[in-house]
Amino acid sequence: MDTVTQQRISKLHPTVREEMVKIINSCNQALQGKAQVRITQGLRTIDEQNKLYALGRTEKGKKVTQAKGGQSIHNYGFAVDICLIIDGKTASWDTAKDWDNDQIADWMECVKIFAQHGWVWGGSWLKFKDMPHFEKKNLTWKQLAKLKLDTSGYVKL
């Protein structure tokens, strides 16, 4: 697991950090070395979320989210976006490529592993497909927004 991913895991909600380490390690083991998972986004501030929401609306760019600040699972530390790092150099979001030649798309191997741990893939959503996105199952931003925060700023479950 690379340093960037480790740093991003360390900022996720404390209740999912250990699980995320297991997920990433399982993905990397399944991918057999050529491709490795990198978390490109984890915990996101309300301000960062609002800036992303502005893209394609009030700011130039393509829409990348349907969620305003506070309305994303990222804002609570229960979501990650990933890419695959190929040969330690190149970032890829190709969901069909099979770099380890095991007849299963590497991205889909990761989707399966995340699902086994109770995480939902944004690529399975019907309206707004978010291919790099995974979030903890059975949590909604509306539920999370009502919870009190601990001294570190994370919601108390």
PLM region spans:
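Cell-envelope/glycan interface and biosynthesis
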Residues: 1-140, 150, 154-156
